[in-house]
Structures are given as C-alpha cells and as structure tokens.
C-alpha cells in the first residue's frame, strides 16, 4: 500500500509500516520547550522521579516569550528553566546570550533535519515541517513524557494535499498563500490532518515555506509539511546539523483525504480580518475599507526572518512612519538582528521612526513590547488575531505580510505595497 511522506516518517521511527489512523509510539528526535511551557514539564519530570533525560542532546529549551523578563513572575518562571538546564548540563539551552524565537532559532541552529519527528510545547512547532520533518505541538505533560522516555504516542494523521501552481507575484509571499488557504478551508478545515504542500514548490523560498507551515495550526492541522528539495538542501549547507537528513517523499498514488489547488499567479496580498485567521480578504478589499491603524508590527516566528526585514527596509527607506502610527520591528533571532545591522537595515528602520526590539514573542501573544490598548488597531505579521490576542479585548489585529505592514506604517492605514 502506498504511503504519504508523513506515514513514511512514522514508519521509519516505529520500525514497521504504519498508516493514517493507527496509534503508534514513536521515537522523538527533538523535544522543544520555552520559558512559559517548560516549567510545567520540569515539574512533571521531577514528580516522576526520573534522574536523567532520555536524550539530553534531543531536548532544547529556548527562552523567548518573556526574555528579558518583564516582571517578577516571569523572572521566577525563567529561573526554573535555567536551574534545570544548568543541573542537567543542557547543550541546547538558549537564553539571553543567544536569544531567539524558538521556531526561527531551532532551524538556524541545525537542530531539525528532514525525516525527523519533532514535538514542542508550543502550537507553532509545526513550523519545522518546512524542512521535511513531521513536527507538531503538544502539551507540557506530553513533553515531560518525552523527556523521560524519548518517545511519545501519536495517531498517524491523514493528509490533505495542497497543490500550488505557478509563481507568486510582486509582494506576495508564503504568508499570503497560507492566509488564502485558511480562508478557503476554515480554521477547522484540516483538523488533526497533515497539510502537505506540493506542486510548484520550487518557486517558493525557504522563509515563505516556514511561514506556511507555521500557520498550518491555524487551519486546525496537526502538522504542515513540505518534502525536501534543492532549496531545503541549500538551507542545510551552512548549518552544523544535529544529524544527517533522511529524505522521504510521498508515493504518487498515496491516499489523501482531500486535495486543494491554489493558483499562485492569481493571488493578491492577503489580509486576515479580526477575529479569525480564516477571515481573509484581498488587499484590494482591505484598501477599499479605509482601515486606519494605530500600530504596525513586523516580527514573530511567522515573519521575523531576514527576508522580512529586507522587504520592510526596501519599502521604508527614505520614508517616515505616519504621525499617529507606531511601528515595532522584532528580528526573530540575534543572528538575524546582527545581519540586519550589517546590511544597514536597522538604520533604515530607526530613521523611519520605528522601534527595533530584541528577539521576543512578547507582542504576538499580548505579553509585552507592543501591547494594544482599548479600541486600537494593529496590522501585524504575526499568526493569530483572536479577541484580545495582542492586548485589550476591544483591540483589533489584522494579519498580513511584511510588505503590507511596512507600507501601512507609512500611510497610517492598511495599504497595498504594490501601489
């Protein structure tokens, strides 16, 4: 019987041919925690009486949500992870000296390779499927179990094939593709499914692939996945990889629950209106709605990569942020920040009137470094726009790509960057 890439990855890890719907216990290659979710896992780990991690080199803690800490509570929370990391001499512990948002930092460090099974106590762990791995978010107790045993149980997900055709136009990126898809199938349209992107995938760069897989969860998906190709292998080239990649590809006549086709050449930049990522409208519709904004935000695990900053800088160069608008730019990792500084992008942002912050998840989750007040409106490159997501319950978040956000910051209203 033919298999999808997801079924093949699980078969490899289980040591037997398995198919969608089967319950399996799989070896885990990398377990990821952060400063918010890891302390819960640590408490469960210690409660179990376990003395050692099953796979110390396959466990990473990334301090990214409230780092540097914003208050006493977050400082005490961070202290739990730090003490655990030092006690166990954790190799993959990333704190203020090497700060970054986990789903940008982990691939940057070479800790995910094709063919892996990855779990993380964060819903956007599905990001890493862009590298040809099965990657999904789990609860902190599940993470503790994997810390203790090196394994976890799964119901092998059915797959939805997303066939992409053509090429993306000017100022249209992976963010627009995934917003379009979610608008088509809804926030539960891929519930517990693997969203497998294929077709003319060679026309999509790696950063766009990360954005697409990152937001698979916003359609309810268990994972997003893209089989490795030359672009993937090029991404791996300058990395000190944790392991040798194993490349798997879906059989031509493998079973898919559904197939969705998207003509990339017909896409416009997309904007997801409050209060769901599925409320996608074209930029033409958004411009017609004359949506004034109070804040523009570029960053997050979805769109805080170097390509996003380059796109924003190209638009902002020589311009000024609108008088009544705030622009916050948050590079996803220190390496990205340093590269942006080297290329002169940080100067462009500051000269335009933007605030450039350290890498953090803070604004995206309404934690700090960009919280919205009552009735404020923000256009953002983040991944969620639920009620109160970035601040006050009466505030509004509109999701868009980096070009749309940069252009909107200049005009003070949601703007088409192509105009």
Curated annotation (Swiss-Prot):
It comes from the Bacteria. The keyword Amino-acid biosynthesis applies. InterPro entries: Acnase/IPM_dHydase_lsu_aba_1/3, Acoase/IPM_deHydtase_lsu_aba, Aconitase_4Fe-4S_BS, Aconitase_4Fe-4S_dom, HAcnase/IPMdehydase_lsu_prok, Homoacnase/IPMdehydase_lsu, IPM_dehydratase_rel_enz, IPMI_cat. Pathway: Amino-acid biosynthesis; L-leucine biosynthesis; L-leucine from 3-methyl-2-oxobutanoate: step 2/4. Pfam families: Aconitase. It is an enzyme of class 4 (lyase). One of its GO terms (molecular function) is 4 iron, 4 sulfur cluster binding. One of its GO terms (biological process) is L-leucine biosynthetic process. Its EC number is 4.2.1.33. It catalyses: (2R,3S)-3-isopropylmalate = (2S)-2-isopropylmalate. PROSITE patterns: ACONITASE_1 (PS00450), ACONITASE_2 (PS01244). Transmembrane segments: none annotated. Binds 1 [4Fe-4S] cluster per subunit. Heterodimer of LeuC and LeuD. Catalyzes the isomerization between 2-isopropylmalate and 3-isopropylmalate, via the formation of 2-isopropylmaleate. Belongs to the aconitase/IPM isomerase family. LeuC type 2 subfamily. This is 3-isopropylmalate dehydratase large subunit. It comes from Campylobacter hominis (strain ATCC BAA-381 / DSM 21671 / CCUG 45161 / LMG 19568 / NCTC 13146 / CH001A).
